[in-house]
Amino acid sequence: MIDRFLDKRNPREWLCLKRTVRFGETDAAGVVHFLELFRWCHETWEESLEKYGIALKDIFPTNEINTSQLDIALPVVHCEANYFQPLYVGDTINIELETEKINESSFVLRFKFKKNGEQIGSTNIKHVSINPITRKKCALSKQINLWLHESSSNF
C-alpha cells in the first residue's frame, strides 16, 4: 500500500538514481554492452516504484503470484535507445526517469543517463496495460496512475 507521507515528498527521491558500471556489464571491447541500458531502465523503474511505496509483487509476477493473479500486466510495446558515449567499468552514472501517461491504458518511461552531468545516453520505453487473462487492453491500475501522476510533477 502507498504511504500517504509521499504527498509531501519530492519526486527526485524516486526518479533520480545512481549506479556504478560493473565488469559483468561490459563486452569484449571493455565498454558497456548495449542491452545493459535496457536492463538498467527496468531496474531503475522497479527501484522507483519501491521508493515511491509500491510493492513489486503488486505489479510483477513472483514465485508466489503468477500473472493470472494480477489485475493487470504491463508489457513493453516499443523501446528505443540512443548511445552518445561509451561507458567503462567503474564509471558512475546518474539515471533520471521521466514519465508520461499517454492515455488510460499506456505510458512512456523516458530515461536519461548522465556521467559527470553530461548526457551519455537515453531510452524510451512504452508500456500498455492489459488484462493478464484476456490479453486485451485495460485501464492502468490505481497505483500506477498515482505513481505516474505524482512522478510527472516538475522537480
UniProtKB/Swiss-Prot annotation:
Catalytic residue positions: 27
Signal peptide: none
InterPro entries: 4-hydroxybenzoyl-CoA_TE, DHNA_CoA_hydrolase, HotDog_dom_sf
Domain of life: Bacteria
GO molecular function: 1,4-dihydroxy-2-naphthoyl-CoA thioesterase activity; fatty acyl-CoA hydrolase activity
Reactions it catalyzes: 1,4-dihydroxy-2-naphthoyl-CoA + H2O = 1,4-dihydroxy-2-naphthoate + CoA + H(+)
One family name in Pfam for this protein: 4HBT_2
Record-linked Gene3D superfamilies: Hotdog Thioesterase
E.C. code: 3.1.2.28
The protein's enzyme class: hydrolase
Key word Hydrolase present: yes
The keyword Isomerase is assigned to this record: no
Biological processes per GO annotation: phylloquinone biosynthetic process
Keywords from the named record: Hydrolase
Chain segments annotated as transmembrane: none
Pathway: Cofactor biosynthesis; phylloquinone biosynthesis; Quinol/quinone metabolism; 1,4-dihydroxy-2-naphthoate biosynthesis; 1,4-dihydroxy-2-naphthoate from chorismate: step 7/7
Family: Belongs to the 4-hydroxybenzoyl-CoA thioesterase family. DHNA-CoA hydrolase subfamily.
Function: Catalyzes the hydrolysis of 1,4-dihydroxy-2-naphthoyl-CoA (DHNA-CoA) to 1,4-dihydroxy-2-naphthoate (DHNA), a reaction involved in phylloquinone (vitamin K1) biosynthesis.
Full protein name: 1,4-dihydroxy-2-naphthoyl-CoA hydrolase
Protein species of origin: Prochlorococcus marinus (strain NATL2A)
